[in-house]
């Protein structure tokens, strides 16, 4: 799945015929996702949304069409895998009790160790409870994992009552002031026996009252994950999921998209066999890797910068028409947008009259860049109240602002003077427009 999408993106970005390349890319995307066991309806919905957006939307000025198209694909794939919802993985209270459930073969016991190591690295004291009594090697496996990562494991090999083991282990670790206790429960049920698994989960839950229940799902089951995740999501209001073995299957995309379609939340994905190969599931980061675009965020940032600037242009039209007043906050936002778009020389080339502007000497451009940095530092030292109404700034505040920005009082005065001159100029423009209307003249 990964290589297929990366190759498709590379081929698209290197093509000469944009329209043809778009159609070919969408077809290839459909094939790749269906091969990855993503539900056909989800794939159709995804590609329909992409087609709709490229028909109805227009790329921002100064953005190359291909980059814009890939940013739309990135947005829609991210939405398929959960959008902007990055999970909260840090405990909201201490001690924090986590109960891990999952069918046999899901990688639940190994995931218990991975999760314990993740929290240990974050500075928490963690304990593991081996409450899986049905798989003969489960206790020994967890003991070995605990030794590898230097985390204590509680178990009672002769006891056949998992609830009793969990209760005793929890009591012991809470006495030892553990911050997080992870309980590895029984995994004796196969896929298709979700009802039995959830019934057992409920019995354990009612006795130990964990703060969180996490279901571990093997990525290789693909879109079959939908039924299990759906039932689990309905049965456990405090539940989340870990999708394990993402590295060993082509069906990972199917499993992830199926889980997301249920409304359940994926917290982590297992990316390898090693105990440190567990990562917080960030949909956008995941999609960025799928597309093989390490710099996708820079493309998105570039598009956002141009859109921000276009929004500012609209704001300035409102200022000139008298609908609103220009503030230092407006000027600050303009400078931020300009800085994101690149050096002054590059920006001048994008503006009308670029031929004349391109003749501005390099030294003058450098001075302009320095002045922008100085003015931004000054505005960073101001309060929101001062940015919205600079007239309240007295001499004492000027000194404080200058000190905070690492500039001179004269430079603060210069910024305020420039702001006042700009406002006066805008008043003149408004007056001229008013006179033109009064005498039936042109607004130009």
From Swiss-Prot:
Question: What does the UniProt keyword field contain?
Answer: Cytoplasm, GTP-binding, Hydrolase, Nucleotide-binding, Ribonucleoprotein, RNA-binding, Signal recognition particle
Q: Which InterPro entries match?
A: AAA+_ATPase, P-loop_NTPase, Signal_recog_part_SRP54_M_sf, Signal_recog_particl_SRP54_hlx, Signal_recog_particle_SRP54_M, SRP/SRP_N, SRP54, SRP54_GTPase_dom
Positions annotated to bind GTP: 102-109, 184-188, 244-247
Q: Which GO terms describe its biological process?
A: SRP-dependent cotranslational protein targeting to membrane
Give the UniProt entry's GO cellular component terms: signal recognition particle
Q: Which SMART domains match?
A: AAA, SRP54, SRP54_N
Q: Where in the cell is it found?
A: Cytoplasm
| Signal sequence segment | none
* UniProt family annotation: Belongs to the GTP-binding SRP family. SRP54 subfamily.
**Function noted in UniProt:** Involved in targeting and insertion of nascent membrane proteins into the cytoplasmic membrane. Binds to the hydrophobic signal sequence of the ribosome-nascent chain (RNC) as it emerges from the ribosomes. The SRP-RNC complex is then targeted to the cytoplasmic membrane where it interacts with the SRP receptor FtsY.
Domain notes for this protein: Composed of three domains: the N-terminal N domain, which is responsible for interactions with the ribosome, the central G domain, which binds GTP, and the C-terminal M domain, which binds the RNA and the signal sequence of the RNC.
Please report the name of this protein according to its UniProt entry. Signal recognition particle 54 kDa protein
What are the top taxonomic ranks of the organism? Answer: Archaea, Thermoproteota, Thermoprotei, Sulfolobales, Sulfolobaceae
């Amino acid at each position: 799945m990964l290589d297929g999408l990366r190759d498709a993106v590379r081929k698209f970005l290197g093509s000469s015929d944009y329209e043809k390349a778009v159609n070919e890319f969408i077809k290839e995307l459909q094939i790749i996702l269906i091969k990855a066991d993503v539900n056909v309806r989800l794939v159709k919905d995804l590609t329909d949304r992409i087609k709709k957006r490229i028909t109805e939307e227009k790329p921002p000025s100064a953005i190359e069409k291909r980059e814009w198209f890939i940013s739309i694909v990135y947005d829609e794939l991210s939405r398929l895998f959960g959008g902007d919802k990055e999970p909260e993985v840090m405990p909201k209270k201490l001690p924090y009790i986590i109960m891990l459930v999952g069918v046999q073969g899901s990688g639940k016991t190994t995931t218990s160790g991975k999760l314990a190591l993740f929290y240990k690295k974050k500075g928490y004291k963690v304990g593991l409870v081996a409450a899986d009594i049905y798989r003969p090697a489960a206790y020994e496996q967890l003991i070995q994992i605990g030794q590898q990562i230097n985390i204590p494991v509680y178990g009672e090999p002769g006891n056949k009552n998992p609830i009793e083991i969990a209760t005793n282990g929890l009591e012991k670790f809470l006495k030892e002031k553990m911050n997080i206790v992870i309980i590895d429960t029984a995994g004796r049920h196969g896929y298709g026996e979700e009802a039995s698994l959830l019934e057992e989960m409920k019995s354990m839950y009612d006795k130990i009252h964990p703060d969180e229940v996490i279901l571990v799902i093997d990525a290789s089951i693909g879109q079959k994950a939908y039924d299990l995740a759906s039932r689990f999501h309905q049965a456990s209001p405090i539940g989340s999921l870990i999708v394990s073995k993402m590295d060993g299957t082509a069906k990972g995309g199917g499993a992830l998209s199926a889980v997301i379609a249920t409304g359940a939340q994926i917290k982590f994905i297992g990316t390898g066999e090693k105990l440190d190969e567990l990562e917080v599931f960030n949909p956008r980061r995941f999609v960025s890797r799928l597309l093989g675009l390490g710099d996708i965020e820079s493309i998105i940032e570039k598009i956002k910068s141009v859109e921000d600037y276009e929004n500012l242009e609209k704001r300035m039209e409102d200022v000139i028409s008298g609908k609103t007043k220009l503030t230092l906050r407006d000027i600050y936002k303009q400078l931020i947008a300009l800085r994101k778009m690149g050096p002054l020389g590059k920006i001048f080339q994008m503006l009308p009259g670029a031929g004349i502007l391109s003749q501005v000497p390099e030294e003058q451009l450098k001075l302009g860049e320095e002045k922008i940095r100085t003015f931004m530092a000054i505005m960073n030292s101001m309060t929101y109240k001062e940015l919205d109404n600079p007239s309240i700034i007295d001499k004492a505040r000027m000194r404080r602002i200058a000190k905070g920005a690492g500039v001179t009082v004269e430079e603060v005065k210069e910024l305020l003077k420039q702001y006042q001159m700009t406002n006066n100029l805008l008043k003149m423009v408004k007056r001229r427009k008013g006179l033109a209307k009064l005498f039936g003249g042109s607004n130009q």
